Regions:
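Binding-site signature for planar aromatic cofactors or substrates
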Residues: 1-163
């Protein structure tokens, strides 16, 4: 099982009655991608940190659309992602979820938090990598850090080639 935070908020989109997608950015690991590729299962969990205590889970089958896949650009446009710090070279994949079950529960264990804003760190990191070595620098990072999961499942092999 994998539990990985995702975001920012503009990177998750509902595409139709049974499909959601989120923009997967380069990161320090690739657990979600590796586990989808292993068994196809995914659960997206959304928690309310303000207002009524609620948790929503979207259970389904996932598909990884890497940035170098011919479907990526069309799907990116269709989804209308609005990432405040979206650096094209750091787009790793789009995760499509065919939602087969929706469940909700109380969020009594979720702490109350006040939203302060998005963190600018991803944009700064990607821009620095681009200045130092361009897309090749990001691809080298992905090859080193994202080739496999912590339990040795294959994830990315040098992807993404920016679209």
């Amino acid at each position: 099982m994998n539990v990985s935070p995702k975001g920012p908020i503009g990177t998750l989109r509902v595409l139709d009655d049974h499909t959601v997608a989120y923009l997967d950015m380069v990161g320090s690991g690739a657990e979600t991608v590796a586990h989808i590729r292993e068994n196809g299962r995914i659960v997206v969990m959304l928690c309310a940190f303000e207002g009524p205590p609620r948790i929503l889970r979207l259970h389904g089958r996932g598909e990884v659309i890497p940035a170098d896949d011919e479907r990526f650009d069309e799907l990116y446009e269709r989804a209308g992602f609005e990432a405040p710090h979206d650096v094209e070279a750091a787009r790793r994949a789009i995760i499509l979820v065919d939602v087969t079950r929706v469940s909700d529960s109380c969020g009594y264990g979720v702490p109350l938090m006040t939203y302060e804003g998005e963190r600018p760190h991803m944009e700064a990191w990607a821009e620095k990598k681009m200045r130092v070595g361009g897309e090749a620098e990001i691809e080298a990072y992905v090859a080193k850090k994202n080739a496999e999961s912590i339990d040795d499942l294959p994830a990315f092999e040098g992807e993404p080639a920016s679209s």
